[in-house]
Amino acid sequence: ALGEIAFGRLFGLEVEMIQKPDGDDGVDFILDGRSIDVKTSEAPFPKLISLKSKIKADIYVLAHTKNNKVAFLGWIRKQNFIDKHQTLIGVEGSPWYVTNEMLNPITTL
């Protein structure tokens, strides 16, 4: 939620603070007609991770949190995520991921 709140503030978008029992269906925001899913990681070497079945948004954004501060590491289009993904082996659901080196700078969103 911290990454979503920071993204909303950065782009002047309203943040949905109500937890929905079924989740947000993979879309956190609509920006210029494009659906956005913000993924937040606290890992020292963060990756943008999603289950294949949950890849629905037009754009994915990777936020990294440390000490209650948020840094946006970049974004990627859905098709590029699908084309460039790797699979986390040995993790339930075998989620897909891309490393932050594959992401576009947040300033170009």
What do the PLM-derived regions correspond to, one by one?
Residues 1-32, 39-109:
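Nucleic-acid endonuclease domains
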